[in-house]
Amino acid sequence: MSSLPPFVTTLDLKLAEKLLKDLQQQGFSITIPAYTRFSASKKGLTCTLYTSGKLVVQGKEQAHFIEFYLEPEILESFGFSHPTTKIDLTPHIGIDESGKGDFFGPLCIAGVYIQANQFSKLQALGVKDSKTLSDKTIRQLASQIKNLCLYHIVKINPAKYNEIYQDFKNLNHLLAWGHATTIEQLILQSGCQTVIVDQFADEKVVLLALKRKKLDVNLTQRHRAEDDLAVAAASILARQAFIDGLEQLSKEIQIPLPKGSSSATQKAGKEVLRKWGEERLRSICKQHFKTLDAILGKVGK
């Protein structure tokens, strides 16, 4: 049995058909108990929609289901996976990245230094984890953050990314280098040595990268650190740099390039290959992704 309490919310019944169809595609078994529109279940998870619109999700797998499907695809709100941003009033640097899971576009690492008198201002602006914000809002907030705080962004465009990756042979080591470089620059600007990082690998990976730069840092690494205001601000700057970079590449090749690494990504990649050739395709993507092999292997078949 799950030790987690059931997740309960209210759903607009206009979305019931989409939810049902999605759950069927995800392999849920469907029944229709009394007073429900349906109840869907599979190992570790049950999702029940009542005729009143009450939606109940329970089971040991509920957190992943809610965070990665229900909230972004159905509810379009993020109260479960991204609760209210925490306010730590100690001046510190927050670091986050964007683009590591995206086939097209740059890898961007951003850092933001927040002083004590800036926390309330950022909170009033609505700064929070970029994953909960639209691209339009991200761009608006990024401009305001840059006007208010010290920041640094490491933007690694695909051609440079592929070159550096050949040296590191490991994405986490490349990310650690980018994090350490960002931290180094913000320490030089601010003098602050207290840093919070959204953890992406074993703690030793970033610590080693900092050691190589001879940086003495009071470092905290933790998962989902975007609940810290400085990290949330950094996530916005990193995301803004990424979406701007992706948009610029799309304009250059006159083909809309999607985020992520999905079937839509492969479709766009095949179009780039047909229109511009393999060399140009390689110059705008992260070549170690298996997506590239899929694109090159399927084109022409």
Swiss-Prot record:
CDD domains (alphabetical): RNase_HII_bacteria_HIII_like (cd06590), RNAse_HIII_N (cd14796)
Cofactor dependency: Mn(2+); Mg(2+)
Record's subcellular location: Cytoplasm
Main localisation: cytoplasm
Sites where the protein binds a divalent metal cation: 96-97, 198
Keywords, in A-Z order: Cytoplasm, Endonuclease, Hydrolase, Magnesium, Metal-binding, Nuclease
Disulfide bonds: none
Enzyme type, top EC level: hydrolase
Residue ranges of every copy of the RNase H type-2 domain listed in the record: 90-301
GO biological process: DNA replication, removal of RNA primer; mismatch repair
Enzyme Commission no: 3.1.26.4
Signal recorded as keyword: no
Pfam families per record: DUF3378 (PF11858), RNase_HII (PF01351)
Cofactor note (record): Manganese or magnesium. Binds 1 divalent metal ion per monomer in the absence of substrate. May bind a second metal ion after substrate binding.
InterPro entries named among the record's database cross-references: RNase_HII/HIII, RNase_HII/HIII_dom, RNase_HIII, RNase_HIII_N, RNaseH-like_sf, RNaseH_sf, TBP_dom_sf
Any Gene Ontology CC annotation: cytoplasm
Family membership: Belongs to the RNase HII family. RnhC subfamily.
Family matches, as HAMAP family: RNase_HIII
Free-text function comment from the UniProt entry: Endonuclease that specifically degrades the RNA of RNA-DNA hybrids.
Protein name as annotated: Ribonuclease HIII
UniProt organism field: Protochlamydia amoebophila (strain UWE25)
Lineage: Bacteria, Pseudomonadati, Chlamydiota, Chlamydiia, Parachlamydiales
Gene for this chain: rnhC
